[in-house]
Amino acid sequence: MNPNQKIITIGSVSLTIATVCFLMQIAILATTVTLHFKQNECNPPANNQVVPCEPIIIERNITEIVYLNNITIEKEVCPEVAEYRNWSKPQCQITGFAPFSKDNSVRLSAGGDIWVTREPYVSCDPGKCYQFALGQGTTLDNKHSNGTIHDRIPHRTLLMNELGVPFHLGTKQVCIAWSSSSCHDGKAWLHVCVTGDDRNATASFIYDGMLVDSIGSWSQNILRTQESECVCINGTCTVVMTDGSASGNADTRVLFIREGKIIHISPLSGSAQHIEECSCYPRYPDVRCVCRDNWKGSNRPVIDIKMADYSINSGYVCSGLVGDTPRSDDSSSNSNCRDPNNERGNPGVKGWAFDNGDDVWMGRTISKDSRSGYETFRVIGGWTTPNSKSQVNRQVIVDSNNWSGYSGIFSVEGKSCINRCFYVELIRGRPQETRVWWTSNSIVVFCGTSGTYGTGSWPDGANINFMPI
């Protein structure tokens, strides 16, 4: 082979090798791009709506990649699409309640800037629980705290913090309110906020941080709502509101709200005579509330709300061990499941109970005359049998030598069941403790447990002599 032929042969081989390498690089590039976009794909929702995919974590090689086995594929993780809550899981079977949270707000107020509050409650979104309360527009160590025993002033606002975080100066004021309710539908928070003149108040409906709807007083006598969480099922939320006399005939209505917009209003029906400050919980596919009769009964009213057709029915908790304060002695108290018992019906206190088959779990003050102490127990047959009085699983939450106050229920969805929890308002200051001019509270929170538990007492714990006057 002459020199020219050698040169041509070497050149041809080199060109062939270069062409093969070039084609391999194109194949590698095509494979990389294809794999990248396959990693990037999101499964569309059932209704075929377009869902944008936002990058969460992207891992990259910092050098040029030549060989496929050295390539790190960029992977973008698509966020889960929020869904409405339906609360379709069964209720957890429990043996009692275990301690969950305590905020110690009043004790901390002795040396820190903590809001003056009352009417607290707890509610949870799908991932976290929050505590709410109606602030008085002042901290405790502040001359404005003088006279905060009063319920309705234009400076009251709804406060919201993560559960266990006291209401410090950085706390968010969600809305203007001297009566409120809040709940999360799975996508966003709904807040029902009542404020204004006693004879012409306004309820604002705030959804996902925006004012969406409102309604004015319909009886011109202190429009008011639950002071605990509302309940949302499949995107429709329901809240109980009352306008009218606190010790006589009043007009109670059940409102149905979707993404902040009122879609239906149902009047109260059934045998309940007076409804205030309901504690509501999901009972799929419906909602059930246990309330306060401030007029005729120390047995608690029950409202059953049908979400499908907006129908309402009502009666009273059957247990003869009644839940309101003041009340008659347990040996003489009564309830027939249908009517108020006409036993020390006025005034009353916000409370809770929930059904467990034929039984009822309930909480109440230990004192039958005042808001002191707090206990929980289960009454055998207490949901279905008139005047049932067989009590089991009693627990002391706050001993009888310490003040309690309002209490209410909230629900938490677990992996396999829905747990019931409750909070107790621990009121301090006036009217019982006249050394100081203010009225405020802390809270203690318990949740249902299927395990064992011990004993104790969890009062507010502030020494009133250490507190600002």
UniProtKB/Swiss-Prot annotation:
Its GO biological process annotations read: carbohydrate metabolic process; immune response; viral budding from plasma membrane
The catalysed reaction is: Hydrolysis of alpha-(2->3)-, alpha-(2->6)-, alpha-(2->8)- glycosidic linkages of terminal sialic acid residues in oligosaccharides, glycoproteins, glycolipids, colominic acid and synthetic substrates
Listed transmembrane segments = 7-29
Region annotation Hypervariable stalk region: where it falls in the sequence: 36-88
Keyword list (alphabetical) reads: Calcium, Disulfide bond, Glycoprotein, Glycosidase, Host cell membrane, Host membrane, Hydrolase, Membrane, Metal-binding, Signal-anchor, Transmembrane, Transmembrane helix, Virion
What does the entry list under GO cellular component?
host cell plasma membrane; membrane; virion membrane
List glycan-bearing residues.
Answer: 61, 70, 86, 146, 200, 234, 402
Region annotated Disordered, chain positions: 324-349
Bilayer topology reads: Single-pass type II membrane protein
Q: Which residues lie on this side of the membrane: Virion surface?
A: 30-469
Stored Gene3D superfamilies: 2.120.10.10
Q: Where does substrate bind?
A: 118, 152, 276-277, 292, 371
Q: How is it modified after translation?
A: N-glycosylated.
Tell me where it resides.
Virion membrane; Host apical cell membrane
InterPro entries from the UniProt entry? Glyco_hydro_34, Sialidase_Influenza_A/B, Sialidase_sf
Annotated stretches, region: Involved in apical transport and lipid raft association: 11-33
Instruction: Return one GO MF term.
Output: exo-alpha-sialidase activity
Please give the residue ranges the record annotates as the region Head of neuraminidase: 91-469
Active-site positions, per UniProt?
A: 151, 406
Q: What is its EC number?
A: 3.2.1.18
Q: How is its activity regulated?
A: Inhibited by the neuraminidase inhibitors zanamivir (Relenza) and oseltamivir (Tamiflu). These drugs interfere with the release of progeny virus from infected cells and are effective against all influenza strains. Resistance to neuraminidase inhibitors is quite rare.
Query: What more does the entry say?
Result: The influenza A genome consist of 8 RNA segments. Genetic variation of hemagglutinin and/or neuraminidase genes results in the emergence of new influenza strains. The mechanism of variation can be the result of point mutations or the result of genetic reassortment between segments of two different strains.
What is the UniProt domain comment for this protein?
Intact N-terminus is essential for virion morphogenesis. Possesses two apical sorting signals, one in the ectodomain, which is likely to be a glycan, and the other in the transmembrane domain. The transmembrane domain also plays a role in lipid raft association.
HAMAP family attached to this UniProt entry: INFV_NRAM (MF_04071)
Q: Which family does it belong to?
A: Belongs to the glycosyl hydrolase 34 family.
Q: Protein name, please?
A: Neuraminidase
To which species is this protein native? Influenza A virus (strain A/Turkey/Wisconsin/1/1966 H9N2)
Q: What are the top taxonomic ranks of the organism?
A: Viruses, Riboviria, Orthornavirae, Negarnaviricota, Polyploviricotina
